[in-house]
């Protein structure tokens, strides 16, 4: 039996079966990268996916360009500066290039479109950034329903075009600055206690600020009767919760999971807290009969920096999600990739608790392992790519190469 990626949660025999199916069909898997935006990202102190609210407006576009074009090309949009580290899109790009996989980028209404080939949904599905979750009216219900249906249609179409062996596996990745906060809001609205255990791109997750925004959003939504005031006691309407507190990525991704449960498509949810919220939404929307099937088909794949972060607890969060909807523990894996040793300082920042995850980095690093490649080799390849992207490290005081005409260091992040 081949070695498994590090299993965080789930039965070992289910994990082995899931990994075996992925190894067999890995070259044919589809990688879907969902870009979305929420005005929640403009709240000061909520995200490190750019050092200012204005810089976070371009994060998704710049990360998608790095993902597609690679580190040796001048990017059309400079990567926004980070407090520390380098964009997780760098890790994802190295994996995709090494495994010969080509991502499909979908723009769900970002303020800045990526200057690479991508799909951009028209309104209402792609109607710009979601409003701040504190308004309790993040998206119109018609938009949420359109995104859910679009996800279902894509999933069903993929199944119809699949070979006789069944639908090819799907990797779902995201880039949504502010998305861990909308994740916490949606989880709370669905009745999952998530305060203090949701991660984020900041060195220390802004738990108090997240909790305040979530409380304000729930109160505003209850005042509009979008989410029942007793949501923790009565089963809430998941579509209403999404409309009140969520972001476009969550809706489209949940629709894809609904189709996967119907068609039998295996899905790797490449991320941490944000993908946990997507899984919770799909479970809430499914009939009780289909929930165990989805739990067997879908797995969370994240980085070790999220999995073992002292200020969050993804495993506990997933246990609560499973218990809430009466399923066995959801499958969850952590990549073995670490950036210890003589690597670029921007990568070593991950070991200090910065950036941690985004743009599918953890899940794609797990694919690397399933392909039989070593995490040490991946770390070396990321080091080489980082030198290509931002140049060799400078002697103290730290300095960074600057994109011509931008004044911004070539860095970016997510969440």
Task: Give the positions of each predicted feature.
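N-terminal loops that bind phosphate or other acidic moieties
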Residues: 1-173, 177-415
């Amino acid at each position: 039996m081949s070695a498994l990626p590090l299993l965080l949660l789930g039965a070992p025999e289910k994990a082995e079966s899931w990994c075996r199916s992925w190894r067999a069909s890995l070259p044919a898997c589809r990688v879907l990268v969902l870009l979305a935006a929420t005005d929640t990202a403009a709240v000061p102190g909520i995200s490190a996916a750019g050092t200012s609210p204005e810089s976070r407006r371009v994060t998704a576009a710049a990360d998608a360009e790095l993902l597609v074009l690679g580190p040796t090309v001048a990017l059309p949009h400079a990567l926004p500066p980070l407090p520390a580290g380098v964009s997780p899109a760098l890790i994802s790009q190295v994996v995709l290039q090494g495994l010969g996989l080509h991502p499909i980028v979908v723009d769900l209404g970002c303020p800045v479109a990526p200057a690479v080939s991508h799909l951009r949904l028209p309104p209402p599905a792609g109607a710009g950034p979601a409003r701040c979750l504190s308004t309790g009216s993040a998206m119109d219900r018609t938009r949420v329903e359109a995104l859910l249906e679009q996800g279902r249609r894509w999933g069903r179409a993929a199944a119809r075009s699949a070979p006789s062996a069944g639908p090819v596996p799907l990797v779902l990745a995201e880039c949504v600055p502010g998305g861990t906060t909308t994740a916490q809001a949606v989880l709370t609205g669905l009745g999952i206690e998530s305060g203090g255990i949701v991660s984020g791109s900041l060195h220390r997750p802004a738990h108090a600020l997240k909790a305040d925004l979530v409380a304000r959003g729930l109160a505003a939504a209850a005042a509009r009767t979008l989410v029942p005031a007793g949501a923790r006691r009565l089963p809430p309407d998941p579509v209403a919760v999404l409309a009140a507190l969520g972001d476009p990525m969550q809706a489209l991704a949940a629709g894809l999971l609904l189709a996967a449960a119907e068609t039998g498509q295996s899905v790797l949810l490449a991320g941490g807290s944000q993908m946990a919220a997507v899984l919770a939404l799909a479970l809430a929307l499914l009939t009780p009969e289909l929930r165990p099937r989805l739990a067997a088909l879908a797995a969370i794949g994240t980085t070790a920096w999220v999995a073992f972060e002292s200020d969050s607890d993804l495993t506990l969060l997933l246990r609560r999600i499973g218990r809430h909807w009466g399923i066995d523990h959801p499958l969850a894996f952590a990549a073995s990739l670490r950036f210890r040793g003589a690597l670029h300082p921007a990568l070593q920042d991950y070991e200090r608790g910065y950036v941690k995850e985004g743009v599918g980095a953890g899940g794609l690093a797990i694919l690397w392992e399933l392909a039989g490649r070593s995490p040490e080799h991946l770390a070396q390849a990321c080091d080489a790519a980082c030198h290509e992207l931002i140049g060799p490290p400078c002697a103290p005081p730290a300095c960074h190469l600057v994109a011509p005409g931008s004044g911004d260091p070539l860095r970016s992040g997510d969440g």
